[in-house]
C-alpha cells in the first residue's frame, strides 16, 4: 500500500464492512517498480523477469491492443540496451512468466492478497500473459494454464474466493476464461454490455441487444457474469465485433465523437488501424449535447436499470453514481484520453453537490441508489435467477426474471424518446419504482421509462 494513501491496517478495517476486490495486475509491472529497477540495475535473480526481444524479430502476428510500439528500448546498468515487451505502453513492462522465478514471485503476490482478505481477485489484462513470437500472443493455451494454476491455489488456500478475468476482447474469447466452468474464472467482465446498451439507446432499437442477451449461456452453476456499464477505462469496441456489423460499430463511434467523446485506436497486423475504445463518461455517452437534464437523467437511469436487471452481479462505477460529466480539462492536463472519466474530487465538492437537490449529481445519485436498494430486496434479481429476454417491436426491451422460489419480475424499458404502448402483455402486480398497482393487458411507458413489475 502506498504510504501516502494508507496502510494494510486501513485495508483490514475496510474488510470489516465490505467484501474486498484486489486488482492482481498479472501481465505487466510498472516501469517505476522495485522489480524493474532491480532488472535495470542487473541485480542477480532478476535477469529473466522481463522479456527481451531482438528488434529484428518478426512480431507482425502479435495482437496489438493499442497504437503504440510493442518493444521499448531500455538501458541497463552496464550501458547495454534491451528491447523489452510492452503490450500497453512504455511505462508498463510485461512480465516473463516463462521464468520460474517470475511465476513464484507472482504466486507470492497472489497469496499475499488472499492473506490480506481478498474476497474477489481481478486478473488484469490476463489474456496477454504468455508470449510466443509468430503467434497472436493472446488467449494462448499457456495463459489458460496459468489461470487454472491461480484458481487451484486460490481454492486450496482461500476457498470461496472469486476470480474475475478482465479481458476486453470479442465475446467468444471473453467467455473462454470460464474454462470448463470449474477450473478458471468464476466471473468474467461482461464487456459487450456497455457498447450494446449505447447502440440501443442511440438507435432507439433494442433488437441487437435483445438478440445477444438471449444467446448468453454459462458453462456451470458456479459461474456468472460481472456486469457493468462504465469503468476507469474507456468503453471497449472489440467486444462488439462478431455481434454487430463493422459499419454499425463505426457509425456508433462517429455518433459519439460528434457528441464529444474521444477515441483510442489500435494497430492491426495488416498495417491499418481500428477504433478500440471510446473515452467518455457514461452519462455523456448516453446523451446528446443539447439534451435537457431531464432527458439526460432518464436515459442514464434506463441504462442502469438494464444493468441491474441482467443476470449476474452488477457493478456501478463511482463516476457514474456521482453523475460525472466529461473532464476535458483533465485530458488536457494529463495528456491521455482516459482522464476524461477519471476526475478526482474532494469530499467537500461531492458533499456540496449531493446536498443540492437541484443538481444533476443529486438526482442521479438518489435515483440510482433507490434502484440499487429495491434490487437488493428482490429474490428475482439473484444472479442465478432465470432470465428471459424479448423485444417488443423496436423500442421496448422486456426482461423477465424468475427466482428459485417462483417469484417473477417483469422489467420493461422504453428505448425511445416517444411514449410507447405495450399491448397483449397480461400483467398483474406492483410496479416497484412508482408503487402503482398494475393489471390488464395494456401498458403505456413514457419516453425512456423503466418499469419493474413484481407479479402477483
What are the language-model segments listed below?
Residues 1-426, 434-456:
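Active-site and adjacent substrate-binding regions of carbohydrate-active enzymes
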Amino acid at each position: 500500500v502506498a504510504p501516502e494513501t494508507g496502510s494494510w491496517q486501513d485495508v483490514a478495517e475496510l474488510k470489516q464492512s465490505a467484501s474486498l476486490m484486489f486488482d492482481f495486475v498479472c501481465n505487466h509491472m510498472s516501469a517505476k517498480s522495485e522489480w524493474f529497477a532491480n532488472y535495470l540495475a542487473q541485480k542477480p535473480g532478476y535477469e529473466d523477469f522481463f522479456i527481451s526481444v531482438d528488434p529484428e524479430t518478426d512480431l507482425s502476428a502479435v495482437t496489438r491492443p493499442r497504437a503504440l510500439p510493442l518493444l521499448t528500448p531500455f538501458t541497463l546498468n552496464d550501458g547495454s540496451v534491451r528491447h523489452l515487451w510492452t503490450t500497453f505502453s512504455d511505462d508498463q513492462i510485461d512480465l516473463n512468466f516463462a521464468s520460474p522465478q517470475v511465476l513464484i514471485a507472482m504466486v507470492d503476490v497472489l497469496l499475499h492478497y488472499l492473506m490480506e482478505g481478498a474476497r474477489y481477485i481481478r486478473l488484469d489484462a490476463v489474456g496477454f500473459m504468455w508470449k510466443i513470437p509468430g503467434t497472436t500472443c493472446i488467449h494462448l493455451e499457456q495463459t489458460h494454464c496459468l489461470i487454472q494454476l491461480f484458481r487451484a491455489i486460490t481454492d486450496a488456500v482461500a476457498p470461496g474466493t472469486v476470480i474475475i478475468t478482465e479481458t476486453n476482447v470479442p465475446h467468444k474469447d471473453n467467455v473462454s476464461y470460464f474454462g470448463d466452468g470449474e477450473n478458471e474464472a468464476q466471473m468474467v467482465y461482461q464487456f459487450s454490455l456497455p457498447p450494446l446498451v449505447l447502440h440501443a439507446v442511440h438507435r432507439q432499437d433494442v433488437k441487437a441487444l435483445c438478440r445477444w442477451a438471449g444467446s448468453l449461456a454459462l458453462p456451470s452453476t458456479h459461474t456468472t457474469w460481472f456486469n457493468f456499464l462504465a469503468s476507469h477505462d474507456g468503453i471497449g469496441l472489440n467486444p462488439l465485433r462478431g455481434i454487430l456489423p463493422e459499419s454499425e460499430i463505426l457509425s456508433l463511434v462517429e455518433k459519439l465523437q460528434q457528441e464529444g467523446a474521444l477515441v483510442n485506436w489500435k494497430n492491426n497486423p495488416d498495417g491499418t488501424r481500428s477504433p478500440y475504445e471510446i473515452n467518455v463518461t457514461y452519462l455523456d455517452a448516453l446523451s446528446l449535447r443539447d439534451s435537457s437534464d431531464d432527458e439526460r437523467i432518464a436515459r442514464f437511469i434506463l441504462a442502469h436499470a438494464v444493468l441491474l436487471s441482467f443476470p449476474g452481479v452488477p457493478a456501478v462505477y463511482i463516476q457514474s453514481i456521482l453523475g460525472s460529466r466529461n473532464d476535458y480539462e483533465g485530458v488536457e492536463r494529463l495528456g491521455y484520453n482516459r482522464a476524461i472519466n477519471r476526475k478526482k474530487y474532494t469530499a467537500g465538492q461531492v458533499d456540496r453537490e449531493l446536498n443540492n437537490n437541484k443538481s444533476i449529481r443529486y438526482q442521479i445519485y438518489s435515483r440510482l441508489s433507490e434502484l440499487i436498494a429495491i434490487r437488493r430486496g428482490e429474490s428475482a434479481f439473484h444472479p442465478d435467477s432465470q432470465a428471459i429476454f424479448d423485444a417488443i417491436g423496436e423500442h421496448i426491451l422486456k426482461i423477465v426474471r424468475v427466482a428459485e422460489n417462483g417469484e417473477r419480475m417483469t422489467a420493461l424499458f422504453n428505448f425511445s424518446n416517444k411514449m410507447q404502448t405495450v399491448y397483449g402483455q397480461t400483467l398483474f402486480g406492483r410496479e416497484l419504482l412508482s408503487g402503482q398497482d398494475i393489471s390488464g393487458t395494456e401498458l403505456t411507458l413514457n419516453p425512456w421509462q423503466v418499469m419493474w413489475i413484481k407479479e402477483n
